[in-house]
Amino acid sequence: MSIMETQPQKILRSGWNAYVNDYAISGGWNYNGEVLIICDAAGGIYVFDGKSGEVIWSQGQVHEGGILSAAIHPLTDRFATGGQDGKIIIWNTHQKKREKIIDLGDGWIENLSWSHDGEMLAVSCSRTVYVYTKEGNEIWKSNNHNSTVSNLGWSINKELATTCYGRVSFFDGMSGKVKQKLEWKGSLVSMVLSPNSDIVVCGSQDNTIHFWRRSTEQDSMMSGYPLKPSALSFDETGSYLATGGSEEVTIWSFKGNGPEGTSPLSLKLHTKPITTLAFAHRGMNLASGSRDGAVVLWDLKSENEESGLSETSVSDSVSKLYWRPDDKALAGLDKQGGVTVWHV
């Protein structure tokens, strides 16, 4: 893989910034990029006009104890939030309206994920996974996993992937039947599926990355990380995987027979550990954020082309980076409650 980096260029241009009342932990752009939805750790929701940054509506303490997770519907004006109160709320984006409240009782709602077609919402609460229709009606729930469910993700074939200690499981999205189990002794802290859903990659508590090819169930491990690789992102083609786990962004090539037997590319500019990574929806732009608030946009090129980059910063540790659906804007959230949007 031939990717190089040059000196910073002016690729990221200032857009707008705002503050929410606590740690900005999750959210995202709505399906058409007109609004940006942000949730803070105290349980507040803020819906911003995507162009101006003006608050369309906000509401505090929607979950007692705080919000833990949020998921933006991929095709319609609704989103879901989950909290420490054991509740999932499905909201109307523009009308400040609760369309459905689901109460699972005791337990934290740590993960939410919409299927790619938006027809199903997956929820994890402790060791159990629930799947609902987009209106919030239960379709099925799983038996208990081996441990707390740490990640959720949907394949393009309407399969739900889950992680817990020692296992990745794939469920049929409609029936809840277990279709595949991929096992490895270790605590899996992060997960990403390749765009074609054949490769599943997990960051592990032991500072390694483990991945499987689902078609063969062949597994491999990539070691040498000083920290837990909690940030993972595939490019749109599934050819390149960006990983955190240190102050460097490590890029593995899945082209040909890779990454086995190949050396990764290390992108060196951050001085503190990587906290979040996000490839653009199209092309090879990669955004990275780190613990000191630095945000870098890498314009990666292959085939011996150089890559430009642009560096900026936010107030504190970067919690999330979200590309607008058209990739012409990037939103960054930080630990101090800062919300920053740049034009690309």
What are these regions (language model features)?
Residues S2-D22:
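A short helix->beta-strand "capping" segment at the edge of beta-propeller domains
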Residues N17-A24, G60-I67, D103-I109, N143-V149, ...:
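WD40/WD-repeat beta-propeller blade N-cap
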Residues Y31-N32, P74-L75, H116-D117, S155-I156, ...:
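Residue-level detector of Asp-centered blade-edge/turn motifs that repeat once per structural unit
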Residues L36, F79, L121, L160-A161, ...:
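Hydrophobic beta-strand positions that form the internal "hydrophobic ladder"
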Residues C39-A42, G82-D85, S124-S126, T163-Y165, ...:
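Conserved strand-to-loop turn within each blade of WD40 beta-propeller repeats
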Residues Y46-F48, I88-W91, Y130-T133, S169-D172, ...:
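WD40-repeat beta-propellers
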Residues G50-S52, T93-K96, T133-N137, G173-G176, ...:
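Short loop/turn segments that connect beta-strands within beta-propeller blades
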